[in-house]
């Protein structure tokens, strides 16, 4: 019961996360656009920090969604089934790994929202959700592609940990994969912050 419920949570959350991030990033970008074509944050002397603050805000919302949904699942399983040796620690570790895998999408979707608009951000988020749903139906294809496609990171790494309740997984260097995902997020975030500091805005239609 615990394993099946956890796998369902991982799959459903991995499909929701891209569209959730896409919508939130789209709304954030649209608010700045409507407030004056990004003039407020672009004219700030700390425009890079302002962009970083928006990214951290989105990460905070994402973290709340993931933690809340996992705690809801944990409490539900505990109250209904009362399984033995079912502690909160593995659930929290699963949540942390899920969040690490999702981080890359935040600066990416925020950049899409600012550069291409709210519609593009939401559209790419929807495509990410569809892609996760599709690729999860083909395990062999998923195994070959997941490391190079950020939308699959949460699904794969979280599933690997949850099914083994360990970072030591035969045939997979899970700590290295998580480190690469986190470093990729940091590098992208730095790159987008530097881009935004020099961005001159876009014409408002």
Locate each region found by the language model.
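Residue-level recognition of membrane-helix boundary sites in multi-pass small-molecule transporters
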Residues: 49, 120-121
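Transmembrane helix-loop junction
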Residues: 31, 43, 74-78, 114, ...
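Helix-loop-helix units of permease transmembrane domains in multi-pass membrane transporters
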Residues: 26-60
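Secretory targeting signals
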Residues: 1-20, 25, 55-118, 126, ...
């Amino acid at each position: 019961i615990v394993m099946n419920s956890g796998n369902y949570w991982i799959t459903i959350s991995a499909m929701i996360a891209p569209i959730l991030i896409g919508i939130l990033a789209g709304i954030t970008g649209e608010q700045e656009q409507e407030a004056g074509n990004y003039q407020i944050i672009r004219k700030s002397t700390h425009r890079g920090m302002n962009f970083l603050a928006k990214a951290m805000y989105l990460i905070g919302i994402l973290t709340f969604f993931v933690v809340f949904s996992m705690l809801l699942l944990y409490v539900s399983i505990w109250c209904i089934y009362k399984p033995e040796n079912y502690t909160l620690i593995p659930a929290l570790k699963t949540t942390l790994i899920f969040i690490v895998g999702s981080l890359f999408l935040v600066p990416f979707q925020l950049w899409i929202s600012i550069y291409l608009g709210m519609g593009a951000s939401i559209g790419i988020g929807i495509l990410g959700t569809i892609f996760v749903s599709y690729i999860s139906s083909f395990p062999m294809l998923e195994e070959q592609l997941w490391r190079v496609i950020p939308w699959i990171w949460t699904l794969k790494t979280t599933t690997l940990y949850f099914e083994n309740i360990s970072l030591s997984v035969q045939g997979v260097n899970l700590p290295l994969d998580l480190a690469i995902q986190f470093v990729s997020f940091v590098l992208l975030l730095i790159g987008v912050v530097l881009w935004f500091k020099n961005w001159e805005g876009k014409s408002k239609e």
